[in-house]
């Protein structure tokens, strides 16, 4: 019986056909078991090609996997080019020796990056997948048709109980505090630090602690003075590229992050996240003194100063101290000169735009801040906050003379005037 000639595929198979490279973001979403499975499948695919007995050079991704490196920075040098893009070339050079690499790694080559150079064409070997296995042009197995090489997903599907989320990337890691979901457990752990306040990364220079390693890395640059990313519009320099990108949107006016509820747009995602808590009512930052919760960590920090009585922001003109830097800035404008922002309705002038905006609500009747207990509405958030103390019974302001507590700062001041009249300090 005559041997049946194999039906030739139109395109020969290269390692690129059976290889998958993740982006940085995709790689971070994989848990360790998924990464190990990926590496195992990639190495098996490569060994299948090498098992033909031909000196096929090892792509950079294989060198990285064998050394235990993460493969997401890999680009397949040698698979892009003119003549060598479709076939595996045997014209190869020895890869520079890597300290600590095995003899097997040192002996494997890397593809010539300049595939379009002049000179005689290099010998090539065409590799095909025939009847589910790899073969060369010299072989003549009795098969009816060539098959495409199995993809990574197909390889994983035929392995023993592959993790389903490796293929679908489901968000199955849920925070028990707020219900937010994540792709992997490590992202969930990092998120939960916003609830616990845990900051495991300490700066060796000043002792300041951070909840994320990346935040510590950016902070360390403040000690070295390194600011490698400079804005070409204004010359301002930044510690990291992401901060520069956000800053440049000030010049371009781009606001790519839009609220799905009200349509308001923002320069960065974190500002959008903070804004959306207005709609959801989420307040993940809780005061450990009184239990009051806030939508932003900065607001919690300012609130906690009430309990300590510390006012870290002091005016260098008159010495008056404030809880927040914004209050200090508004105060300092009083020293700077005439108020710049004037109400078109009554002519009253203010030192900053936010104060004018708050004032204009008196004329418009706008009261966007409503009490969830009784439904009473207010034009300013601070007035709603004071009102809510009627329901909660909270009295955060304490007299330093007698220890009596009050629900508002103005009540403390009025109370202390009695001591001033009596000459009591």
UniProtKB/Swiss-Prot annotation:
It holds the Pfam family KRAB. One of its GO terms (molecular function) is zinc ion binding. Residues 103-116 have a biased composition (Basic and acidic residues). Gene3D superfamilies: 6.10.140.140, Classic Zinc Finger. One of its GO terms (biological process) is regulation of DNA-templated transcription. Belongs to the krueppel C2H2-type zinc-finger protein family. This is Zinc finger protein 2. The gene is ZNF2.
């Amino acid at each position: 019986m005559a041997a049946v000639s194999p039906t030739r595929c139109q395109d020969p198979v290269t390692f690129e056909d059976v290889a998958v490279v993740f982006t940085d973001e995709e790689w971070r979403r994989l848990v360790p078991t998924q990464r190990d499975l990926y590496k195992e499948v990639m190495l098996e695919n490569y060994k299948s090609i090498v098992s033909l007995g031909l000196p096929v050079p090892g792509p950079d991704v294989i060198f990285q996997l064998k050394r235990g490196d993460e493969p997401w920075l890999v680009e397949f040098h040698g698979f892009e080019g003119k003549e060598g893009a479709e076939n595996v070339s045997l014209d190869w050079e020895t890869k520079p020796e890597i300290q600590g690499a095995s003899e097997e790694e040192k002996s494997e080559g890397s593809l010539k990056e300049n595939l379009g150079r002049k000179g005689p064409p290099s010998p090539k070997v065409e590799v095909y997948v025939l009847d589910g296995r790899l073969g060369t042009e010299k072989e003549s197995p009795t098969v009816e048709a060539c098959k495409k090489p199995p993809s990574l997903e197909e390889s994983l599907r035929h392995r023993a109980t592959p993790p389903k989320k490796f293929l679908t990337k489901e968000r199955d890691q849920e925070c028990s505090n707020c219900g937010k979901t994540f792709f992997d457990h490590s992202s969930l752990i990092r998120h939960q630090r916003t609830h616990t306040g845990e900051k495991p990364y300490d700066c060796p220079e000043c002792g300041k602690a951070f909840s994320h390693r990346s935040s510590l890395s950016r902070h360390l640059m403040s000690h070295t003075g390194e600011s490698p990313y400079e804005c070409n519009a204004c010359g301002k320099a930044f510690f990291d590229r992401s901060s520069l990108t956000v800053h440049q949107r000030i010049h371009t006016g781009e606001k790519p992050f839009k609220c799905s509820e009200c349509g308001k747009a923002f320069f960065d995602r974190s500002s959008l996240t903070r804004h959306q808590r207005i709609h959801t009512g989420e307040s993940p930052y809780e005061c450990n003194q009184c239990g009051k919760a806030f939508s932003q960590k900065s607001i919690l920090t300012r609130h906690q100063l009430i309990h300590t009585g510390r006012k870290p922001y002091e005016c260098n003109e008159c010495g008056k101290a404030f809880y927040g830097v914004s209050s200090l800035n508004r105060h300092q404008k009083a020293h700077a000169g005439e108020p710049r922002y004037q109400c078109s309705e009554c002519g009253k002038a203010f030192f900053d735009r936010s104060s004018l905006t708050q004032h204009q609500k008196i004329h418009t009747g706008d009261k966007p801040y409503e009490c969830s207990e009784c439904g009473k509405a207010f034009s300013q958030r601070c007035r709603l906050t004071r009102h809510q103390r009627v329901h909660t019974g909270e009295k955060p302001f304490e007299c330093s003379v007698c220890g009596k507590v009050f629900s508002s700062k103005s009540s403390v001041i009025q109370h202390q005037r009695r001591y001033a009249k009596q000459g009591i300090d």
